Amino acid sequence: MRLPIFLDTDPGIDDAVAIAAAIFAPELDLQLMTTVAGNVSVEKTTRNALQLLHFWNAEIPLAQGAAVPLVRAPRDAASVHGESGMAGYDFVEHNRKPLGIPAFLAIRDALMCAPEPVTLVAIGPLTNIALLLSQCPECKPYIRRLVIMGGSAGRGNCTPNAEFNIAADPEAAACVFRSGIEIVMCGLDVTNQAILTPDYLATLPELNRTGKMLHALFSHYRSGSMQSGLRMHDLCAIAWLVRPDLFTLKPCFVAVETQGEFTSGTTVVDIDGCRGKPANVQVALDLNVKGFQQWVPEVLALAS
């Protein structure tokens, strides 16, 4: 039986790979997409997501979400993904539009109508998820779990300690981590290992139309290089759903720093249980890199 999922995203070049896997992995049933400001503005992430859905002829509803973090000024990752978020490929024109309600309400409505609890997957800042949990707490029993790409038990990537998706809206992340829902965190500890090799990248143009498109986007992606390999951060959240055997997880208490002058956005992961608090997050700490690199070509070959 396919696993029903809703995907909250901020495309973003590596988001495009994660979206492809979410659509085409036979184990998954992607039923709703929502966008959030993150890698670029929410107007751009929405445009990019609609372009991808049209490219794959995927009839999946999409709702536009939060344009700004809960309490602080927005930040983006255009230096990594380019000003548009997905430069490098000429997508064809289309007439697709987002739903007429905000993302968190679209998630609420879809959850309440679902015949079984749904897995939420968030691969951008957690603003939409925090709005859902704070404004619609009645939805919690309808959430099977939340799988996120975000955070780190060690070093950061936008500050010495903080990962971008959490640092972009620490207050939202703190709200989500305190919510009591089941959370799986695929952070930098595993995503920095999730590298597509130069040899594989070179084969993409001959794979299929998706391979050609991704190869064009990757030439503008700044999380690694075509010569050294590219990190597929967001894809790890989808990979865990399909191949959890590739990941080593540990239940930990995780808090999000929102006040520190130098540490705002840090996920404080209590790996050794020093604080004596019960675990609230399943933290991915290691990745079977060889297995991941074998799985990616399998799923992208289906993305025709």
Swiss-Prot record:
Keyword Ion transport: no
Keyword line: Glycosidase, Hydrolase
Domain of life: Bacteria
Gene Ontology molecular function terms on file: purine nucleosidase activity; uridine nucleosidase activity
Enzyme Commission (EC) number: 3.2.-.-
SUPFAM superfamilies: Nucleoside hydrolase
GO biological process assignments: purine nucleobase metabolic process; purine nucleoside catabolic process; pyrimidine nucleobase metabolic process
A Pfam family recorded for this sequence: IU_nuc_hydro
InterPro entries linked: I/U_nuclsd_hydro_CS (IPR015910), Inosine/uridine_hydrolase_dom (IPR001910), IUNH (IPR023186), Nucleosid_hydro_RihC_nonspecif (IPR022976), Ribo_hydro-like (IPR036452)
Keyword Secreted recorded: no
Enzyme class: hydrolase
Active site, per annotation: H233
GO cellular component assignments: cytosol
PANTHER family: INOSINE-URIDINE PREFERRING NUCLEOSIDE HYDROLASE, NON-SPECIFIC RIBONUCLEOSIDE HYDROLASE RIHC
Family of the protein in this entry: Belongs to the IUNH family. RihC subfamily.
Known function: Hydrolyzes both purine and pyrimidine ribonucleosides with a broad-substrate specificity.
Stated name of the protein: Non-specific ribonucleoside hydrolase RihC
Species of origin: Shigella dysenteriae serotype 1 (strain Sd197)
Taxonomic lineage: Bacteria, Pseudomonadati, Pseudomonadota, Gammaproteobacteria, Enterobacterales
